[in-house]
Curated annotation (Swiss-Prot):
Keywords: Aminoacyl-tRNA synthetase, ATP-binding, Cytoplasm, Ligase, Nucleotide-binding, Protein biosynthesis. This is Leucine--tRNA ligase. One of its GO terms (cellular component) is cytosol. Pfam families: Anticodon_1, tRNA-synt_1, tRNA-synt_1_2, tRNA-synt_1g. Belongs to the class-I aminoacyl-tRNA synthetase family. It comes from Yersinia pestis bv. Antiqua (strain Angola). The keyword Transport does not apply. It is an enzyme of class 6 (ligase).
């Protein structure tokens, strides 16, 4: 082996070897235990960023470790290739999305290979290819036939100048990102999949996901939002209309003083027809997009409709108000308002001087003071007629039962979860396989006409979708009847909801999935991705798996057994203020910094002399120009160093602070491992280790070696605390570096230790370990070498170091045989002169002994 560690010489050769040998290519093998490790597939944006590197390094470490345990390991990769950014980039670069996407895929694929990730490249998927989305379209038509798909009008962002639908991220301060025209809300027909039919399953099955982060499961529970309550029907004065509301607090029903309805509710629209002021208010509400998350903090606005509902139990007339905080697409688009016991209702009632009626007593049994705020706690009912004196639960049930008995109420379980709107009015996505025939009938595209192919050779004008702009594209026939194809495309979450299953059989042409392959590999054993996907992607991912199961395509209930959500990668951020007061962000690579003795940044300038403001550590992003290019780091230090730093600098699920000094430290460590191996091999062949004739010093070193193997095995396999595993190997390396190399046994022990160290580091730094394994004479390639097994006998200690205290103060340390009794330890302590002087002529009143660790003598 060469004397110096040169990653540039090693890494290309090793990667070529893997490619030629097809090391990571796998097929189903019933004789071996399978392990499917999957990292969330990347969007081909053009360049890998450090977040990608962290995600894929974690996945690769787990995959290589599991392979060393003798398992049949599948680790695939692909590209989530549809989506809006490609359209923007195509317009900007005067090209079409397809060539831009395919160029990016090629570039990023090479970057992944440079980092040494062990993927089965034969299974590579690009979701924009017809051979992939063909099966998605086919499955959608099957869902339609099962009644799981429907079309309804839903609000979108509409630019009246460009006559196009805008994604939320294309609306800047209420205006179109391209032409700055004020954006309107427009109702258009869209396709939905009934995820709500699976709400109960999605909720209950979270309890089976024992190896998913609790945080993710809690977020999903909240998103599904199961509640038990009552649907209540109000009559409307002088109208045939009925008004339906849902409440989770029927115990407060006697405190309803008004009803609030959404601007788009039929009663609002009916009243607005003869009330111009109300019509203006309704228009304002409907053109203001409000996310549910903003409801709590936004200003509550409303206007009386002039209509009244009748309280089903008291007969009171309740004013009906149109309000901006009621969403038409959530529940019934109407809420009963109990301002005495709901903060939002109280705020609205106070603003518009509406009655506030208390019906729940305070905790001390007194009437609540509602002058400053609502009392939202549950308690005893009063001011509620026949229900006075009932506690919350009894009041809930009594009022619910009464409403049901009168035929104006129905107990109901409700979900916050909404059906999944899968229509996107964009071009770069999979066409939705539906056709509207001449007579207006809507039918699915026949199977023999699938896939509905998206044309890739198009001209982007930045305004309309090429398939919407081309009337010829939509023309088709079904069973000889002319019709028009749907020109909307699928939400890209569709593609990423089932890709994991297609990886099991990417070339399979006889169906969506090959059942034998899918059921061999699935469920995924380990899924790795960011916490930001906790709700959307991970919910659809779970939902789709249940759809596949119910279609007979897979036989498991959940797609992934274990989930690891890696933390973000942070870096220093610097800026200076430009001439117009704007912040100009400077890359940390271009910042020249001064630090104090604690390593804190006290001054920074850029190459042009601008004094920089240090904005602290923040997530690597284009907006703050603080991303570090992985390729630059790989060229400078080697892929193994970058991988090692990524896994060592922080626990996998925590944020990682990028520090180049830490990267340099990782590089120095690999150089030390290389140097120790070089010095060892330079001395020639090694004789076998004779365990029976080891000295105490050699036994101690071998004990440390096998304790390290045991710890690293547990840290990597069970605990997934990769940073502590690396720290343990580093600690062992320090001991090996100091170990004598005088005798044959010393060298034989060093050989055992280095072969173990190289295997423990292999999942993290595979290239250098591949070379070191060869240099050390390891059997075969390290890629097929088994994980080291800790020798239980080696870890048994012949002796123990016992701390001796007198009255709780440490007075000495003694070495005793591992099997020494308490009496023997006391006798040995009495012989220790540092201890003996504190016992001279004094009576020992009490002895506290922790076997093999501590002896405390209480004297006096």
């Amino acid at each position: 082996m060469q004397e110096q560690y040169r990653p540039e010489d090693i890494e290309t050769q090793v990667q070529l070897h893997w490619q030629e040998k097809q090391t990571f290519k796998v097929t189903e093998d019933a004789s071996k235990e399978k392990y499917y490790c999957l990292s969330m597939l990347p969007y081909p944006s053009g360049r890998l960023h450090m977040g990608h590197v962290r995600n894929y390094t974690i996945g690769d470490v787990i995959s290589r470790y599991q392979r060393m345990l003798g398992k049949n390991v599948l680790q695939p990769i692909g590209w989530d290739a549809f989506g809006l950014p490609a359209e923007g980039a195509a317009v900007k670069n005067n090209t079409a999305p397809a060539p831009w996407t395919y160029d990016n895929i090629e570039y990023m694929k090479n970057q992944l290979k440079l980092l040494g990730f062990g993927y089965d490249w034969d299974r590579e998927i690009a979701t924009c290819k017809p051979d992939y989305y063909r099966w998605e379209q086919w499955f959608f038509t099957k869902l339609y036939e099962k009644g799981m798909v429907y079309k309804k009008t839903s609000a979108v962002n509409w630019c009246p100048h460009d006559l196009t639908v805008l994604a939320n991220e294309q609306v800047i301060d209420g205006c179109c990102w391209r032409c700055d025209t004020k954006v309107e809300r427009k109702e258009i027909p869209q396709w939905f999949i009934k995820i709500t039919d699976y709400a109960e399953q999605l909720l209950n099955d979270l309890d089976t996901l024992e190896s998913w982060p609790e945080q993710v499961k809690t977020m999903q529970r909240n998103w599904i939002g199961r509640s038990e309550g009552v649907d209540i029907v109000f009559d409307v004065v002088d109208s045939e209309e009925k008004l339906s509301v849902y409440t989770t607090r029927p115990d407060t029903f006697m405190g309803v003083t008004y009803v609030a309805v959404a601007a788009g509710h039929p009663l609002s629209l009916q009243a607005a027809a003869t009330n111009p002021a109300l019509a203006d208010f309704v228009a304002e509400c409907r053109n203001t997009k409000v996310a549910e998350a903003e409801m709590a903090t936004m200003e509550k606005k409303g206007m009386a409709t002039g209509l009244y509902a009748i309280h089903p139990l008291t007969g009171e007339k309740l004013p009906i108000w149109a309000a901006n905080f009621v969403l038409m697409d959530y529940g019934t688009g109407a809420v009963m308002a109990v301002p005495g016991h709901d903060a939002r209702d109280w705020e609205f009632a106070t603003k518009y001087n509406l009655p506030i009626k208390p019906v729940i007593l305070a905790a001390d049994g007194s009437e609540p003071d509602l002058s400053q705020e609502a009392m939202t706690e549950k308690g005893t009912l009063f001011n509620s007629g026949e229900f006075d004196g009932l506690n919350h639960e009894d009041g809930f049930n009594a009022i619910a039962d009464k409403l049901v008995a009168l035929g104006v109420g129905q107990r109901k379980v409700n979900y916050r979860l909404r059906d999944w709107g899968v229509s996107r009015q964009r071009y770069w996505g999979a066409p939705i396989p539906m056709v509207t025939l001449e007579d207006g009938t809507v039918v699915p595209t026949p199977e023999d006409q699938l896939p509905v192919i998206l044309p890739e050779d198009v001209v982007m004008d930045g305004i309309s979708s090429p398939i919407k702009a081309d009337p010829e594209w939509a023309k088709t026939t079904v069973n000889g009847i002319p019709g028009l194809r749907e020109t909307d495309t699928f939400d890209t979450f569709m593609e990423s909801s089932w890709y994991y299953a297609r990886y099991t059989c990417p070339q399979y042409d006889d169906g969506m999935l090959d059942p034998a392959a899918a059921n061999y590999w699935l469920p995924v054993d380990q899924y790795v991705g960011g916490i930001e996907h906790a709700i959307m992607h991970l919910m659809y991912f779970r939902f789709f798996h249940k759809l596949l199961r119910d279609a007979g395509l897979v036989d498991s209930d959940e797609p992934a057994k274990r989930l690891l959500c890696q933390g973000m990668v942070l870096a220093d951020a610097f800026y200076y203020t430009g001439n117009n007061g704007e912040r100009i962000w400077v890359s940390p690579v271009d910042a020249i910094v001064e630090r104090d003795d604690k390593g804190r940044i006290v001054k920074a300038v850029d190459a042009e002399g601008h004094e920089l403001v240090y904005a602290g550590m923040s997530k690597m992003s284009k907006s703050k120009n603080n991303g570090i290019d992985p390729q630059v780091m790989v060229e400078k230090y080697g892929a193994d160093t970058v991988r090692l730093f990524m896994m060592f600098a922080s626990p996998a699920e925590m944020t990682l602070e990028w520090q180049e000094s830490g990267v340099e430290g990782a590089n120095r460590f690999l150089k030390r491992v290389w140097r120790l191996a070089f010095d060892h091999t330079a001395k020639g062949a090694v004789k076998p280790l004779d365990i029976a004739s080891l000295t105490e010093e050699q036994k101690s070193l071998r004990r440390d070696l096998h304790k390290t193997i045991a710890k690293v095995t547990d840290d990597v396999g069970r605990r997934q605390t990769f940073n502590t595993a690396i720290a343990a190997v580093m600690e062992l390396m320090n001991k090996l570096g100091r170990a004598p190399q005088e005798t044959e046994q010393d060298r034989a022990l060093m050989q055992e230790a280095l072969l173990a160290v190289v295997r423990m580091l292999y999942p993290f730094t595979p290239h250098v370990c591949f070379s070191l394994w060869q240099a050390l004479g390891g059997e075969g390639d390290i890629d097929t070498a088994p994980w080291p097994i800790a020798d239980e006998q080696a870890m048994v200690e012949d002796s123990k170091l016992v701390v001796v205290q007198v009255n709780g103060k440490v007075r000495g340390r003694i070495t005793v045989p591992a099997d020494a009794t308490e009496q023997q330890v006391r006798e040995r302590a009495g012989q220790e002169h540092l201890v003996a002087k504190y016992l001279d002529g004094i009576t020992v009143r009490k002895v506290i002994y922790v076997p093999g660790k501590l002896l405390n003598l209480v004297v006096g």
